[in-house]
C-alpha cells in the first residue's frame, strides 16, 4: 500500500512552515485527519497495520491512543485486531485516563498514534496506563517521521527519540522530512511557523 500517495491524494501532505506538536519546526506536515475522514481508507490502513502486528504474534488485549490525533487511527486498529479501544486525554496539560475507562492489572496494551515524531505523547499515554497497572507491549502509528526506530525499517533511532528501544514500533511508512529546533530553524528567517493541529488547536 502506497501510504505517501494516500496522504497526497487526500491533500494531507502539507508544505510550508509548521510547528509540530513535538516542538520542532518542519517544512512538511502530515494532516492525518484528512486521510482518516474517509472511513474506507481508514479501515484499509488499519488492516495493513494490523497485519504487521499479527505477524509479530503479540498478545494484545487493548489499544489506547492519546487524544485527539490518535483516536481515529487507534479505534480502527483496535477494530482490525478485534480488541477494545480506550483513549487518554490532556486535563490542564497533563495526560489522564477519564470517561470511565479502566485498565485491568497487567492488561496488555498497544499505544497507537496517527503520526509518531519523537514519541513524546505516546510515552505520556503509556505512563498513565502503566500507573494504572497496564503492561505496554508495543507502539503503532500510521506513519513514522523517522526519529524513532520502526520495525522493518533500516533507519536508526535518533537522539530525540522517546520510545523505549526494547519495544516494537509498528508503522506503515517512514516520512523523513527536515526538522529543526525553533532557535535553529532556517525557515524562521522568512516566515512564522503555523500550527495546523494537534495540541492546543
UniProtKB/Swiss-Prot annotation:
Pfam families: Pribosyltran. GO terms for biological process: 'de novo' UMP biosynthetic process; pyrimidine nucleobase biosynthetic process. Orotate binds at residues 117, 145. It catalyses: orotidine 5'-phosphate + diphosphate = orotate + 5-phospho-alpha-D-ribose 1-diphosphate. Transmembrane segments: none annotated. CDD domains: PRTases_typeI. Its cofactor is Mg(2+). It is an enzyme of class 2 (transferase). Disulfide bonds: none annotated. 5-phospho-alpha-D-ribose 1-diphosphate binds at residues 113-121. Coiled coil: none annotated. The keyword Magnesium applies. Its EC number is 2.4.2.10. Homodimer. Catalyzes the transfer of a ribosyl phosphate group from 5-phosphoribose 1-diphosphate to orotate, leading to the formation of orotidine monophosphate (OMP). This is Orotate phosphoribosyltransferase. It comes from Helicobacter acinonychis (strain Sheeba).
Amino acid at each position: 500500500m502506497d501510504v505517501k500517495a494516500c496522504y497526497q491524494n487526500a491533500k494531507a501532505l502539507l508544505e510550508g512552515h509548521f510547528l509540530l506538536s513535538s516542538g520542532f519546526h518542519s517544512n512538511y506536515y502530515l494532516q492525518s485527519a484528512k486521510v482518516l475522514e474517509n472511513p474506507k481508507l481508514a479501515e484499509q490502513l488499519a488492516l495493513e497495520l494490523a497485519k504487521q502486528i499479527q505477524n509479530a504474534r503479540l498478545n494484545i488485549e487493548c489499544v489506547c491512543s492519546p487524544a485527539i490525533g490518535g483516536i481515529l487511527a487507534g479505534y480502527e486498529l483496535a477494530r482490525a485486531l478485534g480488541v477494545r479501544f480506550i483513549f487518554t486525554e490532556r486535563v490542564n496539560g497533563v495526560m489522564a485516563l477519564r470517561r470511565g475507562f479502566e485498565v485491568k492489572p497487567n492488561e496488555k496494551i498497544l499505544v497507537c498514534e496517527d503520526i509518531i515524531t519523537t514519541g513524546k505523547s505516546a510515552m505520556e499515554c503509556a505512563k498513565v496506563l502503566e500507573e494504572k497497572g497496564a503492561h505496554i507491549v508495543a507502539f503503532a502509528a500510521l506513519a513514522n517521521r523517522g526519529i524513532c526506530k520502526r520495525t522493518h525499517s533500516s533507519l536508526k533511532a535518533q537522539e530525540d527519540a522517546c520510545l523505549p528501544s526494547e519495544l516494537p514500533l509498528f508503522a506503515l511508512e517512514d516520512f523523513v522530512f527536515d526538522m529543526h529546533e525553533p532557535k535553529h530553524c532556517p525557515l524562521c528567517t522568512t516566515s512564522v511557523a503555523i500550527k495546523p493541529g494537534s495540541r492546543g488547536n
